[in-house]
Amino acid sequence: SGAMSFAKELENGSAQFYQKLSERFTKEKDLFLSFAKENGDYITQIERAYYGVISDAIEGCFAFNIDPEKYSFKTELSEKTALTDALKRALEIEEKMITFYSDAAEQSKSLMADVPRAFKMVAKKRTLRKEKLSSLLAVKA
């Protein structure tokens, strides 16, 4: 599905962003690396739920109506980007990802409950991640 490919694209972009942050801001390295790893876990979780019901979705002619522009984000940081600015960018990324997963959950309600539940779970986990980032930003600002 286009939505699944797009979810992978978003997760991979976000993972690369956190990987770069871990290399630049070594004091927070473990946190950023854990976020990058979690992104892969999220994809696995969603794929497992989605492909478990895909035959039902195809029979029902299900399709996501996802506008990639609405969820796109920038991952580039200049060499001079301060940690506080990097954290603000991370918060923007998380907000886009939460919106994507919430919208995907809403659109997939007609599928078996596993798919929207998986999308909602990732949105919830990303909300918790956003809270961690906000706390870190408050300390560093």
Task: Spell out what each predicted region is.
Residues 1-141:
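Non-heme di-metal
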